[in-house]
């Protein structure tokens, strides 16, 4: 059997999926696999890595998110077909020119651009200033929506 069995699959934003994969039938839940596919250019999903997960009950409680609501840090690796300790070693699967970057990693394919340079440190755009102001002083409607959507007061600022 070269294909792994996905016992539970959770749908995330377009192009992202999350799957819990049992490495051995008797071993229980051990792996959390993130996959991302660029729907416009890549036919096969690109795996961003696998990492040990907490117990299944903890994963269910956090809806697929790591402890304390944080996503697990993962590295780029090929799609894992047979889960073993050796399979956790990341190896590049795409050429540098066609590789995709992990979300929020800051690393990815470089493209030549004719756009204007980024302003030097110490200057900021009006848009950035407006965003910062809106984050500092949320409106009454924002506070209401935070209160309505949050069950713990620690998420309100």
UniProtKB/Swiss-Prot annotation:
Residues 46-70, 83-157 are annotated as: Disordered. It comes from the Viruses. Signal peptide: none annotated. Residues 114-132 have a biased composition (Polar residues). Residues 88-100, 134-157 have a biased composition (Low complexity). This is Protein p17. The lineage of its organism: Viruses, Riboviria, Orthornavirae, Kitrinoviricota, Alsuviricetes.
């Amino acid at each position: 059997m070269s294909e792994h069995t996905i016992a539970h699959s959770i749908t995330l934003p377009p192009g992202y999926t999350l799957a819990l994969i049992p490495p051995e039938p008797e071993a229980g839940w051990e792996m959390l696999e993130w996959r991302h596919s660029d729907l416009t250019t890549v036919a096969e999903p690109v795996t961003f890595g696998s990492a040990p997960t907490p117990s299944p009950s903890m994963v269910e409680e956090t809806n697929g998110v790591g402890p304390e609501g944080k996503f697990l840090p993962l590295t780029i690796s090929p799609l894992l077909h047979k889960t073993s300790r050796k399979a956790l070693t990341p190896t590049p699967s795409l050429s540098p020119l066609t590789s995709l970057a992990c979300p929020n990693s800051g690393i990815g394919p470089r493209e030549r651009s004719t756009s204007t340079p980024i302003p030097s440190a110490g200057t900021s755009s009006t848009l950035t200033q407006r965003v910062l102001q809106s984050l500092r002083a949320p409106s009454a409607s924002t506070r209401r929506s935070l209160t309505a959507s949050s069950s713990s007061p620690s998420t309100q600022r």
